[in-house]
Every structure is written in C-alpha cells, then in structure tokens.
Design a protein with these regions (language model features):
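Internal gly/pro-rich beta-alpha loop/helix module
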Residues: 1-35, 42-55
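Structural alpha-beta junctions
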Residues: 2-4, 70-71, 168-178, 276, ...
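Conserved acidic residues
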Residues: 3, 145, 279
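Short, acidic/turn-prone active-site loops that include or flank metal/cofactor-
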Residues: 9-12, 204-206, 306-308
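Short gly/pro/ser/thr-enriched loop/turn and capping motifs at secondary-structure boundaries
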Residues: 11-18, 185-187, 289-290
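Flexible inter-domain linker/hinge segments
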Residues: 32-74, 89, 299-301, 305-339
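Hard-cation-handling environments
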Residues: 48-250, 254-255
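Extended hydrophobic packing segments that form well-structured cores
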Residues: 117, 230-339
Length: 339
C-alpha cells in the first residue's frame, strides 16, 4: 500500500500544482529520514458536495492548511467524493498523515470527520427551478449574474446539451444573456460552413439523451467562430475544439465540438463575447466555473435544469454504492476510522 497520499484541497480543483509540490516534499523528507509518515482515514459514510469557494468549507480548508507542518501533522486531506461515480467506495473520507504518531493522526481524522458529519446537508448552496432562478437573476440590479447549470455539467458525465434554460430565456425574451457550452459538433460544423455573420435556420442541442430536453429550432446569427479553441482552468488549459457563437434574440449561445464544462472566461471571449458585460451568464458547470467566474460575478445563482446530474443525491440511481450511506439512508452512521 501507499505510504503517502495527498489529495486536492480545493473545489474547484485549482491547486493541482501545489498539492503535487506537497507530495514531493513529503516523499523527499521521508526518503531522507526526516519524517516517518503514518496515515489515518475516517469514513463519514456520506455523499455531499463541498464547494470550497463558499462557507463553511472555505474556513475548514483554511484551517486544515494551517494545521500542516505543526504539532507533528504532516498533511490533511478531505476526499469529498465524486457524487456521480457509482462505485462501492463512494463517500466522504478524511485522511491525516502524522509524523510517527498514529494516535495523533487518528484523533485529528476523527475530529474532522465528525465535524463533516455534523454538516450534512449544509455545505452546498441551494438550487432553484429554472423560472425562479432566471427571474431572480433578471431582477438583480447589477451585472453580471452568473447562473450555474450543474445538472448538465459535462465534468460529471452529463451530455452538456440540455436546452431547458436556453428555451426559457428565449421564451421570456431575455436580453444581454449568454450561455454555454452546448455540445453539438454538427451544429458547429454547419456554422463554419455558413460563415461568420450568416443568418441560418439551425437546430441545435437536445440531442443526446432524454435528459437533454428538446432541440432548439431557431433563425440564428453566427456571431463568432474559432478553430481549436481552449479555456483556462487555474494554471491549465482545457481544449474545447472548434466552437461557434450563435445569437437567438438577445441570447448568445456558445456551441462546442469537444464536450467539456465551463471553466474559463475564454469560453465566451474566444468568440467576441465579454461575459463581464452581460446581465445573465449561464454556465454548464457545478463549481469549477467559480475559479474564473466567481471573481467577476456580482451574484451567483444555481438552478436545477432537467439534466441528469441530480443535486438531490437521493434521486441518483445508484446500483453499486455500498449501503448504508447518507443521504440515501437518512440514519446512516459514520463508519469512523478505517485505518
């Protein structure tokens, strides 16, 4: 088995380089005989989302960072769990590495694990239905308002072509709105064939699954085209492939060829759309979008579209998840220390 494991602390996962450096430092210190790592793991038996851009997780992550390198604690990690990974091992765990003191590692892992159990249902922001969320965004007196569509997040395995929010924006005649990404390689190809500035009848989105909603049929203006585009995510670049922006009424829609979620502002700026100057910015993402959009958003609203990634994990059709586990089982108890 492994002697040292270091996990991301941040969600969005913008700390990949920092955690790699932490891991390397611990490995080198161990090889030099400077420390003797011992690990403890506490199993909370819960499925939950823990965005570290918001409280209470922001404060907790700052606390565990401050613990490292003091009083014999070498590393502290919280394995959030991937809620849509239907595997027996699903669930939140706390991992503590201490310098030769198993009891100290056990005690801290237990304390942090019990703290997370006490925060069941209290770490993720609320989500609204589509009409309510959009109405709240339109009523807000500043811009931009970022509307998150986590149910159709490609990062969680969704197709990223659900049209519920887009269709609602079109129906209510929304202005100064942009939305993306919608994964539709065929529509992108048609836009390139037609050319920048063309007006064409286009059917797009709503193709892949029953949860995708209905395709949008509209007369669109092609307002942006870019080959082999990318968007940022922390220090990395995420390829989106060929992409096109089409305008339907007052809504600009980003269509992409490579299925991925919204992470960087470049998703829009690649195509001449400045999301900082739009009233409503709809992003298909759960929380990774916050790395770039959080600092510019005047307000962030989560809505629940008809996409397949249910925020209420009791509605996820798990087959392999080991039971009992909260919230599938309301009375699930933490397993406690597993090593």
């Amino acid at each position: 088995g492994a002697d040292i494991i270091v996990l991301y602390k941040e969600f969005p996962h913008t700390d990949v380089v920092e955690r790699a450096e932490d891991l390397l430092d611990l490995v080198l210190a161990t090889l030099r005989g400077q420390v003797k790592p011992v690990m403890s793991v506490y199993d909370c038996r819960q499925i939950q989302s823990y965005p570290t851009t918001l409280q209470p997780m922001r404060a907790l992550v700052d606390r565990i960072k401050a613990m490292e390198g003091r009083d014999g604690i070498l590393s502290v990690s919280i394995a959030h769990c991937f809620p849509y990974g239907d595997v027996p091992e699903i669930g939140t765990r706390v991992l503590v590495i201490a310098d030769g003191d198993k009891k100290k590692a056990d005690a801290l892992a237990t304390a942090l694990g019990e703290e997370l159990v006490g925060r069941r249902g209290k770490t993720a922001p609320p989500a609204f239905d589509v009409p309510t969320g959009i109405a709240e965004g339109r009523a807000f007196n500043d811009l931009p308002v970022v509307i998150a569509d986590p149910a159709d997040n490609a990062g969680g395995g969704a197709p990223s072509d659900n049209t519920d929010i887009l269709r609602h924006l079109i129906e209510i005649g929304a202005e100064s709105a942009c939305l993306g990404p919608i994964w539709d390689p065929i529509a992108v190809r048609l836009c390139f064939d037609a050319g920048l500035g063309a007006r064409i009848p286009l059917r797009f989105g709503g193709k892949i699954a029953p949860t995708s909603g209905q395709p949008v049929d509209a007369e669109v203006e092609i307002v942006g085209l870019k080959r082999d585009a990318w968007q940022s995510f922390g220090p990395t670049q995420v390829p989106v492939g060929d992409c096109a922006a089409v305008k339907v009424g007052g809504v600009e829609v980003v269509l992409i060829a490579n299925r991925t979620q919204a992470t960087g502002l470049e998703l829009f700026t690649n195509l001449g759309i400045d999301p900082r100057q739009r009233k409503l910015v709809v992003v298909k993402s759960t929380n990774h979008f916050m790395a770039a959009y959080g600092p510019v958003a005047k307000k962030v609203i989560y809505v629940e579209s008809g996409g397949p990634l249910r925020r209420d994990h009791r509605k996820v059709p798990y087959v392999k998840a080991e039971r009992p586990i909260w919230p599938l089982d309301a009375d699930a108890k933490p397993r406690g220390l597993v090593f």
